[in-house]
Amino acid sequence: RPDVYKRQVVQFNTAHKHIQGCRACDNCFSKENKACIFNDDFNELASLMAESDVIIFCTPLYWYSFPTQIKAAIDKFYSFIIGKKDVPIKECMLLSCGELEDPHVFDGIVRSFELIAQDRGWKNRGHYLVNSVNEKGGYFKYRTSTKDI
């Protein structure tokens, strides 16, 4: 395949980062060209987003939605709107797992994901959801090759 098809994958693990919730101060990109004037790890993510064409949300399900750590980062996407900054992201996907057997427990996170994709104008490449995951690392028992996703 030509080099144009080679991809670099960067993992940004919000669970191990310090990202404060958005304060809606509307001072985005006003200081040192940083996405958020409150200097936390979101600025690192914003820099990565400014160079990415795809974003994949990979997260456990917490109470029918995104966990706080990734939700804080998603809320700060607001900075790109206020700062009138375009990101080259064109496509997105959701990967999630949850403890309960009922597949409907994913309805909330899937709908939130769909609305994010619609709002940002990203092509929704779908979702891959795994229920009945009861222990740390349990998701990997169900994982298929990325060709299947």
Please give the residue ranges for each predicted region:
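Short acidic (Asp/Glu) and glycine-rich catalytic loops that position anionic groups and cofactors
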Residues: 5, 129-130
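Short, glycine-/small-residue-rich phosphate/pyrophosphate-handling segment
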Residues: 68-69, 83-127
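N-terminal beta1-alpha1-beta2 submodule of the flavodoxin-like/Rossmannoid cofactor-binding fold
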Residues: 2-80, 118, 124, 137-149
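Active-site donor-binding loop signature of nucleotide-sugar glycosyltransferases
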Residues: 14, 97, 130
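Active-site rim beta-loop-alpha module in soluble metabolic enzymes
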Residues: 131-135
